[in-house]
From Swiss-Prot:
Keywords: Amino-acid transport, ATP-binding, Cell membrane, Membrane, Nucleotide-binding, Translocase, Transport. It holds the Pfam family ABC_tran. CDD domains: ABC_MetN_methionine_transporter. ATP binds at residues 38-45. It catalyses: L-methionine(out) + ATP + H2O = L-methionine(in) + ADP + phosphate + H(+); D-methionine(out) + ATP + H2O = D-methionine(in) + ADP + phosphate + H(+). The complex is composed of two ATP-binding proteins (MetN), two transmembrane proteins (MetI) and a solute-binding protein (MetQ). It comes from Staphylococcus aureus (strain N315). SMART domains: AAA, NIL. Part of the ABC transporter complex MetNIQ involved in methionine import. Responsible for energy coupling to the transport system. This is Methionine import ATP-binding protein MetN 1. It is a peripheral membrane protein. It comes from the Bacteria. SUPFAM superfamilies: ACT-like (SSF55021), P-loop containing nucleoside triphosphate hydrolases (SSF52540). The keyword DNA-binding does not apply.
Length: 341
């Protein structure tokens, strides 16, 4: 649906060149809720602006719904933009217009009939739960209600793609949760592909099925949300995951336990998925290795509606200890594991 092929974007300020994007490649599939996460300045917003051609790539290709828009003119983009809706952090509503007129604005600009406008706007306001607010003005609404108006406006043209640029950053946690539920409903009800730009890993965890992690203009990691949460490969991805889920004990706790440890030991970090959470893993391991197994840390969470568990295990070892059977057990049970040294 959206594909970036070795995309770079540079800005020239005075005599300085700023590389906002460097060799970015990934694909957003049809019906995805795809998250792009990174700290401020990572290039996230620049990336999303390439999709609706608010910016043009310096190098590479941007493919939208089968069209290479890299070198499209503004005229050439008109039809493509009809299939793209966008919502922003600060809503971008017209304060002098009613909720109804704000939602209707794209249809008014497209010169649709009054009958069509009324029908379509009424449908969208009902969908976002604001039918009773149609005659009010933005200043009379809460932040969550304003974002619902913005979502209705973005959907009123029946787009194939919805771009969300930090759409929940200005909202409190409870309102954020309700907006994410609404966006998930948008995806499921209308089959709209959603691209979420955010710096909040909780947003990725709660709504997205796939994610790209950005740092300094580059995509440093991509994968399903479950993959990235279960085994983040890069330091920045690990840091983002740790803001939502504690996946391992603190360094101070490990240091204290190591100081108290008598004899040799070997530690494993394991990731247990929902189908395995209720299995007697510790009991199995004790029987396999014939020795004590300690749980130094355990944390459960829900990802994509599935319960998962992170554990840090310690085996007391001696010269006769052989980890072959333990490693084989993890592999047979499809338990992701990592030896900690």
């Amino acid at each position: 649906m959206i594909e970036f092929r070795q995309v770079s974007k540079s800005f020239h300020k005075k005599k300085q060149t700023i590389d906002a994007l460097k060799d970015v490649s990934f694909t957003v599939n049809r019906n995805d809720i795809f998250g792009v996460i990174g700290y401020s300045g990572a290039g996230k917003s620049t990336l999303v602006r390439l999709v609706n051609h608010l910016e043009a790539a310096s190098n590479g290709q941007v493919i939208v719904d089968g069209h290479d828009i890299t070198n499209y003119s503004e005229k050439g983009m008109r039809e493509i933009k009809k299939d793209i809706g966008m919502i922003f952090q600060h809503f971008n509503l017209l304060n002098s217009a009613t909720v109804f007129k704000n939602v209707a604005m794209p249809l008014i600009l497209s010169k649709k009939s009054k009958t069509e406008i009324k029908q379509r706007v009424t449908e969208m306001l009902e969908f976002v739960g604001l039918s009773d607010k149609k005659d009010q003005f933005p200043d009379e609404l809460s932040g969550g209600q304003k974002q619902r108006v913005a979502i209705a406006r973005a959907l009123v043209t029946n787009p194939k793609i919805l771009l969300c640029d930090e759409a929940t950053s200005a909202l409190d946690p409870a309102t954020t949760a309700s907006i994410l539920t609404l966006l998930k409903n948008v995806n499921q009800t209308f089959g709209i592909t959603i691209m979420m730009i955010t710096h909040e890993m909780r947003v990725i965890k709660d709504i997205c099925n796939r994610v790209a992690v950005m740092e300094k203009g580059q995509v440093v990691e991509t994968g399903t949300v479950k993959e990235v949460f279960s085994h983040p490969k890069t330091t920045i991805a690990q840091n983002f995951v740790s803001t939502v889920i504690q996946t391992e004990p603190s360094t101070s706790l490990i240091r204290r336990l190591n100081d108290e440890q008598v004899g040799g030991f070997k530690d494993y970090k394991i990731f247990v998925e929902e189908t395995q959470v209720t299995q007697p893993i510790i009991n199995d391991l004790i029987q396999i290795c014939g020795r004590e197994v300690k749980i130094l840390f355990s944390s459960m969470s829900e990802i994509q509606g599935n319960t998962v568990c992170y554990m840090w295990l310690r085996f007391n070892i001696d010269q006769q200890f052989d980890d072959t059977a333990i490693n084989q057990y993890f592999k047979e049970k499809n338990i992701q594991f990592e030896e900690v040294h």
